[in-house]
Amino acid sequence: MNYLFFDIECANCYNGKGKIYSFGYLICDHNFKIKTPPCDILINPDCKFDPYVKKNILAYPKEVIKASPKFNEAYEEIKQLMTAKNTICFGYGIDNDLHFLADDCKRYSLEKIQARVYDVQKLIALALDRPARKLVIEYTELVGEEEKGTHKSDVDALRTMLVAKSIFVKDNKPIHKYFKD
């Protein structure tokens, strides 16, 4: 069984629709041995960046993002990653990320990506029997490392994996077993 941890960043969410500029991910096995190191698929969102995103979140030069393929060109790679055989996807607070994927699929008239996806934020609630907090807080507390202030989707995917791994190490139970399909 492979686990794909992912995170998404958007240029803006104007009119309630996310426009993706970064899909960060890593792949590991169910024992958390990394098979594919953290990677960002950069995407030209073909829209204006929210001023807040430009100032506080954008981790790449805008020119690099604008020179990247549009979502419809990156779609097959993302879909293949998320729907690969024996792969379960995980994110942190993933409702927004899944909404952003659906928004861009609709925007480009592409089929919605149907993947098996679980939320590590909910895993914390199930495994530790308490409400989960923001990723940076859980990362600092459960992993024991200080957050460095970056806002890259590949880094957030790695942090999400490390939080999930800390629960696996504690309970010695595959994390997907906490969830009922």
Would you name each region that the model predicts?
Residues 12-14, 124, 161:
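Hydrophobic positions within alpha-helical membrane elements
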Residues 15-17, 105, 127, 164:
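Short, function-defining helix-loop hinge/capping sites that tune catalysis or transport
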Residues 88-95, 100-105, 134-181:
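Acidic, Mg2+-coordinating catalytic module of metal-dependent nucleases/exonucleases
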Residues 111-118:
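Short hydrophobic/aromatic-enriched beta-strand-loop microsegments
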Residues 79-82, 109, 168:
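N-terminal cationic-hydrophobic initiation segments that often serve targeting/anchoring roles
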Residues 2-102, 114, 137-143, 151:
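Conserved non-catalytic scaffold segment of RNase H-like nuclease domains
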Residues 118-133:
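Short alpha-helix plus adjacent loop in nuclease-associated cores
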Residues 6, 118, 155:
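Active-site flanking residues adjacent to catalytic metal/cofactor-binding acidic residues
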